[in-house]
From Swiss-Prot:
Residues 1-22 form the signal peptide. InterPro entries: Peptidase_S1, Peptidase_S1_PA, Peptidase_S1_PA_chymotrypsin, Peptidase_S1A, Trypsin_dom, TRYPSIN_HIS, TRYPSIN_SER. Transmembrane segments: none annotated. Disulfide bonds join 56-72, 180-197, 206-230. It catalyses: Preferential cleavage: Arg-|-Xaa, Lys-|-Xaa. One of its GO terms (biological process) is proteolysis. It comes from Drosophila melanogaster (Fruit fly). The gene is betaTry. It is an enzyme of class 3 (hydrolase). It comes from the Eukaryota. It is found in: Secreted, Extracellular space. One of its GO terms (cellular component) is extracellular region. This is Trypsin beta.
Length: 253
């Protein structure tokens, strides 16, 4: 179904059409136009895994709490989840910790993608090091155009069934909520108060791994959430706005 929605969005983009609200394809987790990197450059990044296979990204908030996207945790039990931290490779190295429980934002809506944020509680504490570090939550949004980065292990091309073994990243620029919902871009009123956008010219508009970090100024400003499957300048990637959702994370950590 997800691939159908992405294909539908690409067709609509090519035709200059508008996809009705409610057909909002989630990011399929790809770093297109990205660069291989090491975990020491993104030590807050984790791989969220279902039954041992990479599923989504996430960010270390504390030794026992991970921030990710609510849409990553649909129809899944905590017992099937684990995270790998401290490794540039999702399938080896670093440390693995089981997920004891998780909580989605109570206001998350799979149709509108509002409040697309969740916290994972680990069964054991992470030991911080040069490759395992917590990242702070943004208390305010960066300015429109501010430099940011997105990292993850997503597929490198649309439609690919394989993912890279090594962590990758792309540099992007923040598109403010007000600008992302303006006539400058194609989303209009689908951009809600719990969202922020980012875009990079010449790179896929669906950067990153679902649930993974959008970082600017050394703090977590966004969680990879959704975007239309069309790498056009008028459709930036859309992220859960961490500054807007900060108090929820703190209260549920």
């Amino acid at each position: 179904m997800l691939k159908f929605l992405i294909l539908l969005s690409a067709v609509a983009c090519a035709l200059g059409g508008t996809i009705p609200e409610g057909l909002l394809p989630q990011l399929d987790g790809r770093i297109v136009g990205g660069t291989a990197t090491t975990i020491s450059s993104f030590p807050w990044q984790i791989s969220l895994q279902r039954s041992g296979s990479h599923s989504c990204g996430g960010s270390i908030y504390s030794a026992r709490v991970i921030v990710t996207a609510a849409h990553c945790l649909q129809s899944v039990s905590a017992s099937s989840l684990q995270i790998r931290a401290g490794s540039s490779y999702w399938s080896s190295g670093g440390v693995v910790a089981k997920v004891s429980s998780f909580k989605n934002h109570e206001g998350y809506n799979a149709n509108t993608m509002v409040n697309d944020i969740a916290v994972l509680h680990l069964s054991s504490s992470l030991s911080f090091s040069s490759t395992i570090k917590a990242i702070g939550l943004a208390s305010s949004n960066p300015a429109n155009g501010a430099a940011a980065s997105v990292s993850g292990w997503g597929t490198e091309s649309s439609g690919s069934s394989s993912i890279p073994s090594q962590l990758r990243y792309v540099n992007v620029n923040i598109v403010s909520q007000s600008r992302c919902s303006s006539s400058s871009y194609g989303y209009g009123n689908q951009i809600k108060s719990s969202m922020i956008c980012a875009f990079a010219s010449g790179k896929d508009s669906c950067q990153g791994d679902s649930g993974g970090p959008l970082v600017s100024g050394g703090v977590l400003v966004g969680v990879v959430s959704w975007g239309y499957g069309c790498a056009a300048a008028n459709y930036p990637g859309v992220y859960a706005d961490v500054a807007a959702l900060r108090s929820w994370v703190i209260n549920n950590a």
